[in-house]
Amino acid sequence: MRTRLVDFDAVGWLKRAAKAAGAFAVVSVCLVTFAQAETRTLKLYNTHTKERVSITFKKNGRYLPDGLREANRFLRDWRRNEMTKIDPELLDLVWEVYQKVGASQPIHVVSSYRSPATNNMLRKRSSGVAKNSQHTLGKAMDFFIPGVKLATLRATGLRKEVGGVGYYPRSGSPFVHMDTGSVRHWPRMSRSELARVFPDGKTLHFPSDGKPMSGYKVALAESKSGRSRSSKPTI
């Protein structure tokens, strides 16, 4: 019995593979170049001081010192008029969420930086204020955007998997919390609710039953390799 060998053009296959890889590389470079060429501007409104501002904090992949200083000023602890250095990645996170939801109205800031004194004062009033809040580190913002459902903001923030996402639909002024700390969310969503946000189960977020979603290991591997977050730009 003779076995028929299938002809295999190794050279041709390598050429096609190289061509495909080259095309992929070109697309990747184009995407990176496009991202670096962006001008990132945040339109903000402080719900307490009534201040309005438009801050351009990044251009051509680089953070702008003047824009960062203006963000530090605007997102200050308004109660004590104290400032800190706001995490530039927080600005990126909020900007990317804003773009993703297709918003057009200014972002209404409820809270951002909190001095330790202000945080301690608020902790005495509410058990929902963390002792080591990301707000005290300049890494958090509580906000809402007129015309955008709060649930949509939460889902978009969850998908970014950059840090924490809090959901406060019953607050006097309903808002979401986003920070650049560890990946987590509250209140914990049920498994079915989280599955609607992540149909493939690929997420670092844990549902209320405390068990990881089906794609957790893949999400964790991507997170460790840096694929889930963009590389840090230059300041």
Q: Language-model features: where?
A:
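Active-site acidic/histidine clusters and adjacent loop/turn architecture
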Residues: 59-108
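Bacterial N-terminal signal peptides that target proteins for export
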Residues: 3-22
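Sec/Tat signal peptide C-region and signal peptidase I cleavage site
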Residues: 32-37
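Bacterial N-terminal signal peptides
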Residues: 21-30
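Acidic helix-start/capping segments at beta-turn-to-alpha-helix junctions
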Residues: 106-121
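Catalytic cores and adjacent binding grooves of peptidoglycan-active enzymes
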Residues: 40-45, 129-140, 145-235
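Charged, often glycine-rich, active-site loop that binds/positions anionic groups
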Residues: 117-133
